[in-house]
Every structure is written in structure tokens, then in C-alpha cells.
Amino acid sequence: MISLKQYYFDKFKWSLMALASSKKKKKNLLPENSMVGEEIVLEYEEAVGENLERIHEYIDITEKQLVLLRDLDAYISGKSGEKYAYLWLENSSLDDSEWQEIRRLAMAVILAFH
């Protein structure tokens, strides 16, 4: 049986890789007609928890990694509300500058783990 620590770490890795991937790769990760941005961000949010509490509880993380993760988390959190609904609900937005920044921030977190 998989431990909670392993479960959340695997979900964390998957969500970071999905956030960092190109529009084409993102769309291939989920069933056709999915709201890709929303689904990936929901997976990420489930992995890290509110205020990153799951990270602190289940994942061993350095201060540098945590700083980069906080940057990503703050950026995603800052794109909430009606004004940014298109980012999460419209697959055509996956190439927009906001998603390019999410990819860059997610890749920085990934690289910090290597």
C-alpha cells in the first residue's frame, strides 16, 4: 500500500510536470474536451494543499525549493477570480503569456529538485 507521503509526492511531481509542459503535451494528459488548465491546477492544489501545508507535512523540501514553490503558488493564486477564468476554462489560453509564466515558474521548481 502506498503511503500518504508517496501519494502526495507523486501527485506533486505529476502536477509540476504538467504545469511545466507545452500546450500540446498538457492537452494529451487529460481526456478530450477537458478544461485542461483547471484540471491541472486542481491536481496541483490537491498536491500542495492550502498554504502549502501538504508540502510541509509530506514532502522534504529545502528553503530554496520552498521559495521557488511559493513564487509559483503565489502566481497561480493571483490569477483567480472572474477576470482570469479564461485561463483555467479555455484551452485556447494555454499559450498565453500567463501560462508561459506558469511553465517557467514550474520548471524552476522542478530544476531545484535536481
Locations of regions flagged by a protein language model:
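Aromatic-residue detector
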Residues: 36, 43-44, 85-89, 101, ...
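Amphipathic protein-protein interaction modules
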Residues: 49-104
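Short, flexible helix-adjacent loops and helix caps
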Residues: 24-28, 88, 114
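Short terminal alpha-helical segments
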Residues: 1-49
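Amphipathic alpha-helical segments that form well-ordered structural scaffolds
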Residues: 105-109
